[in-house]
Amino acid sequence: MRGILKKISQINFGLMSPEDIRKMSVAQIVTPDTYDEDGYPIENELMDPRLGVIGSSLRCRSCGAKGGECPGHFGSINLARPVIHVGFADTIHKILSSICRKCSRILLTETEIQDYRQRILEAMEREESLTPIIKEIYAEARRDRCPHCEEEQEEIKLDKPVSIVEGDYKLTPSEVRERLERITDNDSLLLGVNPEVARPEWMVLTVLPVPPVTVRPSITLETGERSEDDLTHKLVDILRINQRLKENMEAGAPQLIVEDLWELLQYHVTTYFDNEASGVPPARHRSGRPLKTLAQRLKGKEGRFRSNLSGKRVNFSARTVVSPDPNVSVNEVGVPELIAKEVTVPVYVTEWNIDRMKEHIENGPDVHPGANYVIRPDGRKIRAYNETKDVVLENLKPGYIVERHLKDGDIVLFNRQPSLHRMSMMAHEVRVLPYKTFRLNLCVCPPYNADFDGDEMNMHVFQTEESRAEAKTLMRVQDHILSPRFRDLSSGVYTTISQEHTSSQGKRLFSVRSRPPDPQEGRAPPPDREGREWTVKEIFSMVLPDDLNMVYLAEICRKCDECLEMDWENDAYVVIENGQLITGVIDEKAYGAFAGKILDQIVKEYGSDAAKEFLDSATKLAIAGIMHAGFTTSTNDEEIPEEAKERIEAHLRNAEARVDQLIEAYENGELEPLPGRSLEETLEMKIMQVLGEAKDKSGEIAESYFDMDENHAVIMALTGARGAMLNLTQITACVGQQSVHGGRITRGYDNRTLPHFKKGELGAKSRGFVHSSYKEDSILLEFMGGREGLVDTAIRTAQSGYMQRRLVNALQDLTVDENGRVVDNRGVIIQTRFGEDGVDPAKSDYGKIVDLDKLVQEIRLKSGK
């Protein structure tokens, strides 16, 4: 086949006339058979060799090409009677409702016709949409009497999918076609059918195109039997019924039999085009599986457009499970050697790299870093086997391409599905490692939403210098630390850095830093008076930039009425002066996901590479600190003394008694309804309020008995590393009210939630209040709130996925031009300034152009105030 050499400037959509279908056809298909006894295709049947061939042993009878090279050719079936095309049934119904049943003129006066025709021609000249004008014409052309021949009109209905009913009479496709044939070209244009490319009667089929064999290839099963494609099955049905209809018509069969066969032919043609058309039972395989016909090949997630055109399987990609590795840098990905040897990078041989390329070829495909193929300037591909290696090395010269293995430092694209935002696909540098999983730094998990319970990720290897340059410029991990920022460092950082004691293991801590490796080099702080130790704050200061100045409140801040600043015992007031941590603890607020103050400042003042260095160094320091100081948690962290348990129990009993009082007041008619609420709603709201307060108070009691300095579970909750205080108090004190649809549990068996409660009981326990803690015991009602959460999550995921797809399709053509305007692909201005203020959220201070408070703080710190 020759390629198209001319540039395509536009595409016109139209309908094929019966003559066009016959001209395009290379064979008229008559009988419903496929192969003869020897397994060869028969002429004038569905696998006619003129329609194209599959399998390299046969040649196409139309173009002479072998199987695999022949694109295929259309055939045609002459239908015994016309049938309506199911895709145009709605259009036919609209047209018939707008034209006269006798003369087929449009139901408009001559003046109106001239006026609308002029408007359409002007809109076509300006290349504007005709849809609003056509809609207006259809709305106007609904009249009871024809303005041209004075014929009375009857209401026309569409009985889905293709039956047209006028009054009480069902129109046959032949009658429909006759009416459409009488429409003039001028009227056709007003009805939205351009006579240059289509005629209304072509929507009623008299000739059916038969797709090429290459579109519906038959396969040979293991048993040796041939299995035909679903389209071929459907075409066999159409041919069989068409043949029977023709024979019955020629034999003069009764009208009833002819009409039944005609209906059946219409059914088969309808399901051939769309096997999910409403009002028609789907055509099925012998096994009961619905056939996948033309519309199903194109429609939906598995169809041609979304499955094969928008998204497709590609070469030079790899997929495997991901594992955590804190020794891999934030912007790196650990690639298994097995993958590195299989997925290659094409490198042009030059006089500067020829020796290095020869080394790769020498190693061959089995030794890393080697090469798998060499491509000669004439395009021939040679595998770098041991047998051919010497010849390849001898002939290698500039201009050849060597497909070498992946090696350290190569840039690749890393992706985790579902790809919900731009940080689901980022550029990483390769580090080739042993074993069979991708290795990922834990800092990069939040943007990918990855965890290590079996998640798999995809890697794509760039094949051109342009794509590599683009990825390095736009997609590096460190360039996406902001908007949204990520990173949720382990709570061990808090423990190490908040401890006021000094570390006699200072050198051991420093040795894990990427630079400098020894505390005596670079910015090592001076040792204390005895010359042996450093404070942990001094150690942490080593990973901060020299002139960093900032003040903020840490995650553990209690939000006191009057800020105690540096005097607060829990060290929640963070002050950094000229790169030295003076006071404060380092927790999630320092470099957590969406909240990292220090990380945020470093990115904005020193750039993304400095932020990457800080993340790497802080991670290594944290891990070394945890290894040195130890950090673990167990159920003992959720233990409280008996005294606390008694206080909690008394408080909960008191709350349940108050609930009983409310119920008694309701039953005695003493309860006053709240404004705008019924008595029942008032009772439920007051009960929920009492039980909510009881749960909160029991949590506060439990919290007051926790050791804030030594209890590791509490440290994790306070620093934002994992969980919240609510989780701890539910484990320790009281789970609380289980909520379903925003209220207490009401549904159950015969006017009660569980069989062991009294009928109609309204008490706290019988409606889902869990008195005990997770640690003590549980009741059956506990699962109901959790179950609602799971169902909600599943439904929300589907809804948000569909919503995002619609938004992406609607907004994908919008861009911000060089003037800061939002424009679509036609140049139409959507916004004169992006976001109305022209601020890039990624470079703003949480949406603001400038943070004045931060600037004032910096000036004060730099001036020593």
Curated annotation (Swiss-Prot):
Residues 515-531 have a biased composition (Basic and acidic residues). Its EC number is 2.7.7.6. It catalyses: RNA(n) + a ribonucleoside 5'-triphosphate = RNA(n+1) + diphosphate. Coiled coil: none annotated. It comes from Methanothermobacter thermautotrophicus (strain Winter) (Methanobacterium thermoautotrophicum). One of its GO terms (molecular function) is magnesium ion binding. GO terms for cellular component: cytoplasm; DNA-directed RNA polymerase complex. Pfam families: RNA_pol_Rpb1_1, RNA_pol_Rpb1_2, RNA_pol_Rpb1_3, RNA_pol_Rpb1_4, RNA_pol_Rpb1_5. Zn(2+) 1 binds at C60, C63, C70, H73. Keywords: Cytoplasm, DNA-binding, DNA-directed RNA polymerase, Magnesium, Metal-binding, Nucleotidyltransferase, Transcription, Transferase, Zinc. It comes from the Archaea. Its cofactor is Mg(2+); Zn(2+). This is DNA-directed RNA polymerase subunit Rpo1N. It is found in: Cytoplasm. InterPro entries: DNA-dir_RpoC_beta_prime, RNA_pol_asu, RNA_pol_N, RNA_pol_Rpb1_1, RNA_pol_Rpb1_3, RNA_pol_Rpb1_4, RNA_pol_Rpb1_5, RNA_pol_Rpb1_clamp_domain. Disulfide bonds: none annotated. The keyword Metal-binding applies. Mg(2+) binds at D451, D453, D455. Zn(2+) 2 binds at C100, C103, C146, C149. Its main location: cytoplasm. GO terms for biological process: DNA-templated transcription. Part of the RNA polymerase complex. Residues 500-531 are annotated as: Disordered.
